[in-house]
Amino acid sequence: MADPTTYRPAPGTIPTEPGVYKFRDENRRVIYVGKAKNLRSRLSNYFQDVTQLHPRTRQMVFAASSVEWTVVSSEVEALQLEYTWIKRFDPRFNVKYRDDKTYPMLAVSTGERFPRAFFFRGPRRKGVRYFGPYSHAWAVRETLDLLTRVFPMRTCSKGVFNRHESLGRPCLLGYIDKCAAPCVGRVSEEEHREIVDGFTSFMAGHTDKVTRKLNADMMAAAEELDFERAARLRDDLEAIDKVMEKQAVVLGDGTDADIIAFATDQLEAAVQVFNIRGGRIRGQRGWVVDKPGDYAGLLVDATTQPEGDAPETDPALPFLMQDFLVQFYGDAVERAETEAKEDAAVIERRGVDKHSFEEAAPVTRASVVPREILVQVAPNEAEQTLKVLEELRGAGVDARVPQRGDKRALMETVERNAKELLKQHKLKRVGDLTARSAALQELQEALDMEQAPLRIECTDISHIQGTDVVASLVVFEDGLPRKSDYRRYRVKEAAGDGHSNDVASIAEITRRRFLRHNQDKLAVPEAEEFDGSTFSDEKVEEMSTDARRFAYPPQIFIVDGGAPQVAAAQEVFDELGIVDVVLIGLAKRLEEIWLPGDPDPVILPRNSQALFLLQQIRDEAHRFAITYHRQQRSKRMRVSELDSIKGLGQSRRTELVKHFGSVAKLKEASVEDISQVKGFGPKLAEAVYEGLHASK
């Protein structure tokens, strides 16, 4: 790995114009591509104090051995060249939104002589047109089942097709009119292609055109007294209605739009895209990617990273949005143009009538880049990004943040899906046995432990400006949460008068937890104490079950914070003689691991299973603490001054407030006024008056 100072450009050699730059490693491979309004200003950030760089950026500059740049005439050109180079070089430190191969799709093999429709999951192939993605496999199969009643195109494999072609009789679908049976010549190649065109046109969103044609044909058949055909067309319309019912209208104005939202944490970002066509959700997909730290303005400001509760506050979000818009729609247009070329080749090779083929609503730039793009936040360099999108579409694009109404509500739905995607991704990383074993093994090695940790505990403090100060203690055993051992605390000594000392709070909770450990250890009898007469089986079970949870210390005890919190907890360990527990602090912002007495933190790799496990434990402690804090705050806010008055039950308190309107107005009342309330005599009225005015 090269020291960045060894390849730093000489002063004054970097131009100040807009441009795109490449970092290369010692093997001349491009490892990172970036753009800049001012190349000199941007590149100089990489060669300052490397300790101040974001961890991922720091890793990149040490992996590189040279840097190159290309000057361009405008920021829009820089954005386009950056996208081109990322596609060409596939740099490992750039964010790349690759196709997720797990989403089910509905595919049509347009390159075959008799195209077929089929369920598909995997990398895209040439000569196939895709619709979706769908959230569930059953949705693909159900859609296909309903639409083949209207568009009886081939759905069988090549082997099944060839077998029935040689037998001279169709399969079951041919007999029940869910396939036009081209295998036995019931329809010609051109007639089958027209059926396929209708199917793809419907799937591309041209539903009104299809339903109008079917309705007109049905009416014409009825006028000609061809009631059998009219009934069949009526059934086709009902089948289409069923498909449409399953795609509920979410935007009543029939909008074509894409809705895009992110959810982020310190290390990763999840993005969700909902495709709305004709006001209905036609597709949904998502990605989870590593979040780089070298965006302009964030290169050295890594401490501003969010905790994950409010992604809209993440300063990296506009940059993520810009990268995604350019990559996502650039790739979509490239695929559309490739499919158009393949379709043209089919026309030429098969001799299909071009006019009928174009009726199938071919994929165009305008169909993959919609007129309206609703985004969670405005992208970085919004004007330049919009110009790139308009060039990709070949027409105007309206990219904006919805503020109210149905579109805002739909954006909130997409945001929730993005958060759920990120949550499920993080759980998946630590949920399976292999990943958990690897995480525990990595922790053992990183912390120089003799054995992999079986039990890990973590504490977190929660408060608002020193009020309702509480703490949580969560327990993970074998990498999984053990919720029966969770504990929550009200901080006593370190809280009060509107201020809270987080360091003192950590010390208090650590002391209380390990004092309990020492007490429980004494409460569990040693093996030699059991002689069969001193304790009954029931007594032994009662004693050990109640005490065993905290009689044995964790192998790792995590405090939420950095060096000060770790030092405070270590003082408690020294005071109580705790020597068999590894104490660490996990700093939220940079995900650094602090050990007692060490001047520098331990940095785990971003893709480390151990780091994901520690994050999950810390986040669980935070969730448990903040939930308890909210409960305490709500409880305090519900407490009334009337609660402290003896002899005043709930019904009488309610009657007083109902009579006077509020406690404030009740305070203004005299003893005589209070005694006028039903159920209040002079003695009780006097007690209420004294109780309210004594509390001042």
Swiss-Prot record:
CDD domains given in the database record: GIY-YIG_UvrC_Cho
Record domain GIY-YIG: where: 16-95
SUPFAM superfamilies hit by this protein: C-terminal UvrC-binding domain of UvrB (SSF46600), GIY-YIG endonuclease (SSF82771), RuvA domain 2-like (SSF47781)
Domain of life: Bacteria
GO cellular component: cytoplasm; excinuclease repair complex
A single GO molecular function term of this UniProt record: excinuclease ABC activity
GO BP terms, alphabetized: nucleotide-excision repair; SOS response
PANTHER family: UVRABC SYSTEM PROTEIN C, UVRC/OXIDOREDUCTASE
Subunit structure: Interacts with UvrB in an incision complex.
Function: The UvrABC repair system catalyzes the recognition and processing of DNA lesions. UvrC both incises the 5' and 3' sides of the lesion. The N-terminal half is responsible for the 3' incision and the C-terminal half is responsible for the 5' incision.
Protein name, per record: UvrABC system protein C
Native organism: Corynebacterium glutamicum (strain R)
